[in-house]
């Protein structure tokens, strides 16, 4: 069953340049991952719609930052997949700039869901993504996708290995098993996203209340 968080999910906008990002007034959670790791399929599974986020058998097709609204001031942000060598160099360089700038400077961004194929986790580019984002001090949760491709015992062994690595190198980064085919892990991921949006919304409200309070304390010119 689809979590109530996604009941009113809808496409909001697509962006190819940092200057075109929508106003950062709400809470955003980014979805990032290597090309063909199952990022769009994971989003579709969470939302409960087969083609909500575009999926393709050709890696590198998600070339823009896509925003999906989950109700007022809540956004899932689908980032371009990285690591597809056949994309022209100029486009790859543009993606690097787009991704790194968004992840490191976006004030509305509360956390990142990092998608890794459970059969090929912690690639060089995955580690680079973690390094980029670790500098922000924001939350990271890893989805080890395509868990149905491994036996249960092997999947759990990989999960334990990745959890130990992250606890040592990136404290605060959490991880779970996920399968778009069987929906394993969808409920767990949905609960985490709900918590993040709630926490992020509370933080935004506190900042707004503080700003209003400061405005009231500041004397108007001429007083």
Curated annotation (Swiss-Prot):
The keyword Transmembrane does not apply. GTP binds at residues 33-40, 60-64, 78-81, 145-148, 178-180. Residues 25-199 form the EngB-type G domain. It comes from the Bacteria. Keywords: Cell cycle, Cell division, GTP-binding, Magnesium, Metal-binding, Nucleotide-binding, Septation. Belongs to the TRAFAC class TrmE-Era-EngA-EngB-Septin-like GTPase superfamily. EngB GTPase family. Necessary for normal cell division and for the maintenance of normal septation. This is Probable GTP-binding protein EngB. It comes from Nitrosomonas eutropha (strain DSM 101675 / C91 / Nm57). The gene is engB.
């Amino acid at each position: 069953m689809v979590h109530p968080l996604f009941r009113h999910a809808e496409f909001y906008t697509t962006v190819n340049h940092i200057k075109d990002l929508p106003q950062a007034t709400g809470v955003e959670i980014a979805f990032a991952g290597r090309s063909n790791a199952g990022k769009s399929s994971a989003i579709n599974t969470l939302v409960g719609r087969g083609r909500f986020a575009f999926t393709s058998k050709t890696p590198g097709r998600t070339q823009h930052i896509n925003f999906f609204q989950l109700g007022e001031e809540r956004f899932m942000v689908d980032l371009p997949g990285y690591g597809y060598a056949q994309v022209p160099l100029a486009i790859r360089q543009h993606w690097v700039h787009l991704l790194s700038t968004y992840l490191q400077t976006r004030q509305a961004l509360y956390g990142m869901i990092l998608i890794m194929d459970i059969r090929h986790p912690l690639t060089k580019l995955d580690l680079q993504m973690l390094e980029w984002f670790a500098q922000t001090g924001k939350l990271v949760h890893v989805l080890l996708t395509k868990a149905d491709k491994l036996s249960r015992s092997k999947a759990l062994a990989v999960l334990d290995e990745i959890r130990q690595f992250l606890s040592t190198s990136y404290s605060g980064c959490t991880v779970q098993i996920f399968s778009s085919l069987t929906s394993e892990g969808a409920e767990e991921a949905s609960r985490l996203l709900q918590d993040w949006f709630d926490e992020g919304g509370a933080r935004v409200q506190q900042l707004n209340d503080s700003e209003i309070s400061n405005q009231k304390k500041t004397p108007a010119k001429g007083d």
